Each structure stands twice: as structure tokens, then as C-alpha cells.
Amino acid sequence: ISFLKDNFVQVVELGIQSTNNDVLSAVGRPCGFTTVRGAVKSIRKRNLTLGLQLMPGLPKDDESTFLQSVKDVIGLRPDFVRIYPTLVIRNTTLFKMYSRGEYLPWSLDRMLQLVKAAMIEFEKADIPVIRVGLHSDPSMLENLVDGPYHPSFRYLVDSLIARDKMVSMIERLKNIPPELTFKVPSNKVSLYLGHKKSNIDKIKKIFGINNIFLQQTSNQEDLKLVA
């Protein structure tokens, strides 16, 4: 750490993947969460910017285990977080486990729901998630074998969160009219619409609403139900 500081390094990222020792052991990580805590303490002592990376869906991981990892990471108070859903890439240890039938990748829907829950927790803790999902690198795509990959993974997660916000507002109404209008910031319209208007279609089906209109506004920070 001293060497990094002396050479003007300002940001350090740790790919901790998980805080669960069983998960870390299953993927051959040599250090456990205690070691991670020690490293974070050393980084903080030298006033370096700290980023932590998580990988949901590793062997022996599940929803409760990963959300505990999220809670543990929040306790470490990093400056930012990246979340990389686990994918099976050719010529890796995980690929060998997959080939032997020892690892089953998560579905896209399952991963989206888990990452959504994690994003909500990080937002509550005021910790920015600066990246979700891998870049669409040609080399990676050539070697991608299986797993919950989507080129717009972050958009899908943010769109699910947006849908939940609309649903929550509608649920608070005493009487739900056949038509509703939401005011949304112009830069978030696509999030509230959902992919191919999936959010609007889903909400209409849930509540038996005939029409949902989105009214663009540039002077609002968040969603507002107006009718």
C-alpha cells in the first residue's frame, strides 16, 4: 500500500467477489473475509479511494448469502462498488466445473432480481454502484459459454427498480382509476417504460388499468403520480 501511495496511485479496487468464506473456498480464493477487512483498513489508513467488486451467483452462493455480502460491504464503506454477475467463460476454472456438471449458472431473471435488491441496499447506504455487468467485449463474447449475460444488464435492473416505484405509488391509492399519469424526468422515461414497454404492460395487468401515461418533465428529480 505504501508503494502505491508513494507512486501517486489514488484509487484501489479489490475484487473480493463475496464475503462468504464457503463461496470463496469453492472458487479457490486463498483469502477469506478477515483478510479483506485488513486490506480495507490499510487502504483507508492511507486515504486512498476504495472500490470493491462483487460477483453474485458463484458456486455455493444464493440470495441470502449474497445479500449478506452486500451488508458486509456496506459495513466497509467503500467509495464505490462494481457488480459483475457470474458468467461461465471458456478455459476458466468455473468452465471446468460447469463442464463436469458441478456448477449451474443462474438464469437472467433470477440474477436481475438479486442485483436489484443489492442496488437498492447500496442506494440506501449512499454507496454508488458505478458498474453492473461486463462490457460487451468481443473477446469475452466469443468465449462466453453460459450465464446471465445481457448487453444492457444495468438498464434492466434500473428499469425493474423504476417499475417497483410505480407499483408502490399505485398501491397507496384508495381507489385506482382506469387511467393513470406519472410525471417523470425526461432522462428516465425509458426506465419507467421498460424494455418494449414491459413495465407499462406489467402494471396494467397487475392493477387492471386501461392506460398509463408518462408525462415528461425536466425540472423534477424523481417520479410523481399526478392522476
Please give the residue ranges for each predicted region:
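Conserved non-cysteine loop/helix-boundary elements of the Radical SAM core domain that shape
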Residues: 1-86, 90-109
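Auxiliary Fe-S-binding modules of radical SAM enzymes
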Residues: 101-227
